[in-house]
Amino acid sequence: MIIKPRVRGFICVTTHPAGCAASVREQIAYVARRGPIERGPKKVLVIGASTGYGLAARIAAAFGAGAATLGVFFERAPADAKPGTAGWYNSAAFHDEAAARGLQATSINGDAFSDEIKHKTIDAIRRDLGQVDLVVYSVAAPRRTHPKTGVTHQSTLKPIGHAVRLRGIDTDNEAIKETLLQPATPDEIADTVAVMGGEDWRMWIDALDAAGVLADGAKTTAFTYLGEQVTHDIYWNGSIGEAKKDLDRTVLALRGKLAARGGDARVSVLKAVVTQASSAIPMMPLYLSLLFKVMKARGTHEGCIEQVDGLLRDSLYGAQPHVDAEGRLRADRLELDPAVQTRVLELWDQVTDDNLYTLTDFAGYKAEFLRLFGFGIDGVDYDAPVEPNVRIPNLIE
């Protein structure tokens, strides 16, 4: 079938298998150009492995360090001529490329928050890997059903204590709009922490440790975004910020647990990129469009694979890791360059409907958004029929 993009709000409801595969190959090629990751991991579990930063981590570990990988994700398979999700096709392509290079790859499709998937993961590690020496936690989900209580918690994107008015882009109409966000209630804050805080990461590490499948010297990292002044009302001072602070508290306990056996636990702070999650946040399309404009002009623009490949080489397995005062690994230094942030702030209130395409790189933002779903990738013939029914080898469901 011929598949074209169909966008509704912040979601593209179609995906292109060949485009997703080409995107994965592009990321693999980037890692290969940079050469082997010295002293890198050899047996890696990535929780949230099918898109964005999690996929990039799996690619960097496998094709940069030669690691065997186990990926956990929650994706929809193709069915009845209806395409699957982008993460499904990304993972299928990853498996194909790994097999072609003799790299061990196993994937598990299911709810990472559940005890069932944790147990399946432990069984798979015992069978295929024995133990893992790196656990990457890269889960972005709007809700979580707690495995012990059965309660489903919904995350909320709201400020705390006062309403906040945000500038943004109505991406459907390509117009500047303002959104008034009301403050979160105590229950909404608690629910957001339950979904996006550190509890599930801790549950994973506790379960893996108790099962004896964490190697001596094992490391774990959870990915997060903090941002700067223009995004702080939402990302640090809001409901999501409370979840990020919970992550910072959680990592201290995990670090103590792993350090006893020569390991480490760190929160890794990555730069703002276009993801399905970030595109749903009212201010982020405008911020990202401005950030792209400024960073591309300076030659410092990076996407997921550049960020995570650099994180592994420079910090997780580098001799001189970039660590902030709170002990987090920082890969977002170029975004937070004062010259970059000053220029973004200067342009922030100047953007109008008329100059959207000149003051910002909204065109680049839209292109990156479509790339998430396999569209706009060089070398792909989008007028040619493509087979949507793609299977993932070594998949556990």
Swiss-Prot record:
Example GO BP: fatty acid biosynthetic process
Database matches in InterPro entries: Eno_Rdtase_FAD-bd_dom (IPR024906), Enoyl-CoA_Rdtase_cat_dom (IPR024910), FabV-like_NADH_b (IPR050048), Trans-2-enoyl-CoA_reductase (IPR010758)
E.C. no: 1.3.1.9
Keyword line: Fatty acid biosynthesis, Fatty acid metabolism, Lipid biosynthesis, Lipid metabolism, NAD, Oxidoreductase
A molecular function GO annotation: NAD binding
Gene3D superfamilies on file: NAD(P)-binding Rossmann-like Domain
Residues where NAD(+) binds: 48-53, 74-75, 111-112, 139-140, 244, 273-275
Coiled-coil positions: none
List of catalytic residues: 235 (proton donor)
Listed pathway(s): Lipid metabolism; fatty acid biosynthesis
Binding site for substrate: 225
Catalytic activity: a 2,3-saturated acyl-[ACP] + NAD(+) = a (2E)-enoyl-[ACP] + NADH + H(+)
Site (Plays an important role in discriminating NADH against NADPH): 75
Enzyme class label: oxidoreductase
Entry annotated with the keyword Transcription regulation: no
Pfam family, one: Enoyl_reductase
HAMAP family the UniProt entry points to: FabV_reductase
Function text: Involved in the final reduction of the elongation cycle of fatty acid synthesis (FAS II). Catalyzes the reduction of a carbon-carbon double bond in an enoyl moiety that is covalently linked to an acyl carrier protein (ACP).
Protein family (similarity comment): Belongs to the TER reductase family.
Subunit structure: Monomer.
Protein name: Enoyl-[acyl-carrier-protein] reductase [NADH]
